[in-house]
């Protein structure tokens, strides 16, 4: 493992929408991220099920759409004081906060809260399921442009400069309208002085120095390579390797399997520079592990799904690759530290967890 190959962007993305996690739980996640040498915390703050950040001038967002979660579980939101605590805690741990409002898809919670985001003025019902791709902002709705500008201007103002605009899985958005809406979100961030991050579907609209996050290896990669040639930087989050909500095996109670199962060995056995054919190595900004919380309700749930795989993802982000024998031999000692912090973990096979 060579320190000289460390990536600049070493991140963890946490979904606080499908299930809500309060400030103290978010800070505990930060402690874990910092422990593993990560330097970015990406918080997914809006989706079909809920809206998690209070926005001045748009009280309906939290009044009508903050209490939703998957399966009807309790929701919640962060007010200005909560967000200040989160931001200060991140800074004190060497973490740059990267907040995300996901648009134009994944927007049922916003559409439910604000009649003016719907062309006919009729709000859809709240959503507690796990399907994706059915909701979208509409250019024709009277409040869309003002809403997009207001929420992203505020998010940029209260962030550390990086703002994620989403852009994924907009299956119900017509192509030209998608382009117009993505331009609307990105322009709002740029005009407010922020740096744009977006999911890979929005790669064609990114500019020099901005970042695209690659998550689905099954999608065509030409637009990502083309973006890299324009000077866009690439964050690698391949779902088959570092989506840490994937079940470890078929017997895992938590998690999902839409990208198969992901044991520790699969997270550890990959090389970022080989993920996308034709992608220049110098275009890779780094690696970001992700955890989506459809099935996770508590910090212990998060911890169990993150560990030990986050240790592997973080080592790849720091060093570029892993020597499995060396990594595996060191895990029992690392796990003793985890126990001191009150973290729980999956006892992946092939590791002598009781050694020492």
How would you label these PLM feature ranges?
Residues 39-40, 96, 195, 233, ...:
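Residue-level detector of anion-binding/catalytic polar loops
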Residues 1-134, 143-145, 149-160:
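Feature activates predominantly on carbohydrate-active enzymes
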Residues 17, 46-50, 100-106, 168-170, ...:
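Active-site beta-loop-alpha junctions enriched in small/polar residues
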């Amino acid at each position: 493992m060579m320190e000289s190959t460390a990536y600049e962007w070493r991140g963890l993305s946490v979904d606080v929408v499908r299930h809500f996690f309060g400030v103290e739980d978010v800070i505990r996640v930060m402690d874990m991220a910092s422990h593993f040498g990560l330097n970015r915390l990406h918080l997914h703050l809006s989706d079909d099920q809920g809206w998690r950040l209070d926005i001045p001038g748009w009280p309906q967002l939290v009044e009508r759409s903050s209490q939703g979660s998957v399966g009807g579980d309790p929701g919640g939101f962060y007010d200005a004081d909560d967000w200040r605590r989160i931001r200060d805690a991140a800074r004190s741990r060497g973490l740059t906060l990267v907040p995300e409002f996901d648009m134009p898809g994944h927007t049922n919670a916003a559409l439910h809260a604000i009649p003016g985001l719907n062309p006919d003025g009729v709000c859809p019902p709240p959503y507690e399921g796990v399907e994706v791709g059915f909701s979208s902002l509409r250019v024709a709705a009277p409040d869309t442009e003002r809403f997009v500008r207001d929420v992203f201007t505020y998010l940029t103002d209260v962030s550390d400069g990086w703002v994620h605009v989403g852009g994924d899985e907009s299956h119900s958005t017509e192509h030209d309208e998608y382009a117009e809406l993505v331009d609307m979100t990105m322009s709002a961030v740029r005009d407010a002085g922020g740096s744009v991050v977006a999911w890979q579907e929005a790669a064609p609209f990114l500019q020099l120095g901005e970042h695209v996050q690659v998550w689905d290896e099954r999608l065509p990669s030409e637009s990502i390579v083309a973006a890299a040639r324009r000077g866009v930087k690439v964050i690698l989050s391949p779902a088959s390797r570092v989506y840490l909500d994937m079940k470890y095996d078929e017997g895992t109670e938590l998690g999902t399997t839409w990208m198969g199962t992901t044991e520790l060995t699969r997270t550890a056995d990959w090389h970022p520079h080989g993920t996308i054919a034709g992608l220049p190595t110098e275009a890779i900004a780094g690696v970001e592990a992700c955890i989506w919380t459809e099935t996770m309700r508590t910090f212990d749930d998060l911890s169990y799904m993150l560990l030990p795989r986050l240790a592997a993802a973080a080592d790849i982000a720091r060093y570029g690759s892993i020597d499995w024998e060396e990594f595996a031999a060191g895990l029992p000692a690392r796990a003793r530290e985890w126990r001191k912090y009150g973290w729980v973990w999956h006892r992946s096979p092939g590791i002598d967890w009781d050694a020492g």
